[in-house]
């Protein structure tokens, strides 16, 4: 027995047989040990053949184990188990060797062991019974005319079934979603496949536009016989390149697998069309020192027309891999797959609607499909239709399905309340005082009411769930019947087709309508139901908002109120700048109502004015109002961009420079957070060439970064602040605080001297901030003191400042040329520092209120007014 004349699988089975003998303490390797090991081998051909012959493999394996247990085990020292081969096991190998010669093979393989076991082993004979001829046929089919010329022949057996999937068969079994549209591309593919030579189309398009769907559409047409005669008997196999490469342990094993696949395709005489998704992976696949890659192995067959192949890849990968190999490129014919428009996407979604309804057990409204196409096109800019729209619908269905499986919010709240009351009840039962007894009585009454409410809600939920389950079951039956109708029509089974089309399907549709009507009558409108089973455009909007951070869902009442009073909210934080506040809040309201220009940012403003009048504060307060946090503001200090080359930091370093992979500070921030306030602070400090980058943002709402990716700025508010013309404003402002026309012209003259006309012309508005008046200062004092009180709240201390003291603070700190900042410093010196000293010295208890007054000497006095109990 020469172990080197056996395949790796047989060698592995013998090794496992030795281990089995050691476990059973047997000196000899028995035939059952070898056969049990062969049956349990990973990816066992022995097991695979028996399973296809409908042999009970588990029972056969148990029979082998039982037989092994009947052999006498040997106990003792220095006994070597599994060192010898039994007479019957030796006969098995000898007989297998004779089968090897009969098949004209070079190595003993698993099928030889199986044939030998069928002749020699009584246990195997008993289970195989009268299926010997069936097994012989299966072995013949699996081998496919191949000879065992290597120690790993299994890779050559049924290579296509192992490393690919039959798309035509999947269509017949109804496993594939329908393909809607793409008729021109499918026809183009069919034309190329019908050529004599170079009949290999390659589908090129962006990720998610439907390249794989075109091949699935071709498979569906083949099943429906809606193809030219030359393609009627064809089948489409999708090659799984990762499976082809995975587990190829030995040198040349990958090439052997690929050759086996290509041999099957070639021997099919053009009946098999090979589909290779991500075909660029062929270039370089399996490449080792001195070995050919997969691409070079395909070239001869492609050129001769022996291999019918459809490839699919993206534009970038085609350029990077295929175009570089011109010999491979010329053997393929390009089919460009463009992104469908919104109307085509809606048609595709309508075609898929029923499949998703049946899978998720929900109802999808048509307006949800329209919203998915339109919103994904407008807001999800880094992906392509129809993929992103289909994902939206799928996610929305999954969301509703998840909600259906859990308790509604109303019932959940009641359950929590009941649990809370029960815990309180058990605690009060241990108390003996009158107050506790009184509370216990009240609590038990409330608990009884809550339990009654809980039972009613639970009953209603169960009823709705039962009716929804009936609807889901009926929809699934209808879907199965429609699939059966397609199969019957394809197979020309007219009697069955007529029965389904005119009997079963109309009856199921009628029953489904009745169930839906009853459900509608009993449960009322969708909004009245405890459990929602309908996907609407609101769910689609919510998911777009989750993915992008852009609020596109319908306005809820709280948000509606917030938007209508946005200017009031901003006025509380920004004092004395009514025009600026109104302009910014109006821009946000226009955008949220959906009537802004969809190709430009929400708003772009240039704020001009002296320092400390609220330019930056307005941007911060806007971010806080819209997003409940100032962190959503992208702040770029333009004083960092004083050099001409600093523009690369905004959009990213060019190729070859350090930091190219990191992206730009502005572009990456907006890509991560497309709905935000962008504050370009102190723009006059930046180099003038930096503003050329802003031209595209302000006009088209987009910017291309250093990697060539387009970043969407259409949902941002761009605010620039500058001190240009502030001296003119300070010198010429009226006593009322109004800015005169001549002052405005003088400021604009200063502005035109600094900014290019094309920048200024693209701004929505240039807003002049007026210097702060004495009246404004008193309001700012209130604001500063409110913030101080918020900080003191943590220590349970509060401060009250008299009106006289407030007026004095505003008057003393008033410096028009510096705005509100001197006031903040003045309050720090006059109130915060003395207060801090008192707190450290005296250590106020919680609940202390400190009153600040102004005495006759114009000095502030601090008195501890009261202590709350």
UniProtKB/Swiss-Prot annotation:
It is found in: Cytoplasm. Residues 390-524 form a coiled coil. Residues 447-468 are annotated as: Disordered. One of its GO terms (molecular function) is ATP hydrolysis activity. Residues 158-339 are annotated as: NBD1. Residues 559-771 are annotated as: NBD2. Its main location: cytoplasm. Residues 772-869 are annotated as: C-terminal. The Clp repeat (R) domain probably functions as a substrate-discriminating domain, recruiting aggregated proteins to the ClpB hexamer and/or stabilizing bound proteins. The NBD2 domain is responsible for oligomerization, whereas the NBD1 domain stabilizes the hexamer probably in an ATP-dependent manner. The movement of the coiled-coil domain is essential for ClpB ability to rescue proteins from an aggregated state, probably by pulling apart large aggregated proteins, which are bound between the coiled-coils motifs of adjacent ClpB subunits in the functional hexamer. NCBIfam families: chaperone_ClpB (TIGR03346). This is Chaperone protein ClpB.
